[in-house]
């Protein structure tokens, strides 16, 4: 049986599932709070006007691409810190936790600089009315100011989760969501002496909230009793560039994997623009709902990177392989439930997004594609998380590039926009390619995880393969 789960008792599997769920659930709530923040931005900007909504959508696409890519790089801290804890090297843990804070701040500063540098070419590329373009740039500037804090927060996220205390992340994320709503309103409408920014105020609210996130979580972990034995500021020293290089060696492939995935959906949105507003609106609606479901396997994947990292760091590769298998079972079970939910509630789901019968009709069809790829999407996400726990990131990056850019984007363009293979399929061609790309990624990453975990187990036992 895959990952030799047949050798474990039902009680052992359930006990490990509870351990994973204990880590995953608070992180899932935190991720939902973050998605809800973006949802609030969209709704509040839309209330101001169409131009403001367009500005927020375009500005957010730039911000999210940079944010997700850098978040992937900082995610290297999860397995690094977990390995130190597994090997009981508290000194190395304290050192890298503190250096990770510097690393996040500096990486975020580079990301902020990149976003600001992109403003000039974006003004040239965006063929929009000048007032809309100005709002896009104002949004990007505000969001960029928060980028150093955003990456420092991700470093603190890795620190807290590796110690097995993700509730701190959840509490701060919920507080940030509560703060974002009044901040949006104040900056959009120019209350209390603040300039009236319209929808662009959401970008500045985002930047401010990221600083709140960072400082609040830093305060929490600095004073709460759960972190008494590993105070992050106690190990703070001058930036160590050798440690930064070690973080980058592991983190850059993760960041590229994240970039490949997020850019796939960004490029598809741009490519289907010529198919009309109904197609674009339907695609974005179905994608938004799929992203919400994606929080389930993603939270399990983050928990696995910690749990697998702990045991791999301790040299207990049998436990690491077993945990990977339990996580995969959990993810596939949740994906099966999500698939059933989507299939049964396709029309009500689309009614939440639009009353336009054309959007609903097309959306109910696209949701069939979304239902089909739930299992393989969960498999590729969870396998990636477990592999990060083993500090294996280069091969997953290559698999993601091949799956998403070749099988996903390349095949999608051929099926959706040309007659080269079959008569032009339009939006359905892109979603067919999405299903194929996620299936390829899911199968390859699951195979690689099974093979890599088996090799480490046998090597640990002195067995030559």
Swiss-Prot record:
GO biological process: monoatomic ion transport
Domain of life: Bacteria
Topology term for the membrane: Multi-pass membrane protein
Keywords annotated in UniProt: Antiport, Cell inner membrane, Cell membrane, Ion transport, Membrane, Transmembrane, Transmembrane helix, Transport
Localisation per UniProt entry: Cell inner membrane
A GO molecular function held by the record: xenobiotic transmembrane transporter activity
Main location: membrane
Stored InterPro entries: MATE_fam, MATE_MdtK, MdtK-like
Bilayer-crossing regions: 21-43, 58-80, 100-122, 137-156, 169-191, 201-223, 250-272, 287-309, 322-344, 359-376, 395-417, 427-449
Pfam families (alphabetical): MatE (PF01554)
CDD domains: MATE_NorM_like
Gene Ontology cellular component terms for the protein in this record: plasma membrane
Family label: Belongs to the multi antimicrobial extrusion (MATE) (TC 2.A.66.1) family.
Job description of the protein: Multidrug efflux pump.
The protein, known as: Probable multidrug resistance protein NorM
Organism, scientific name: Chromobacterium violaceum (strain ATCC 12472 / DSM 30191 / JCM 1249 / CCUG 213 / NBRC 12614 / NCIMB 9131 / NCTC 9757 / MK)
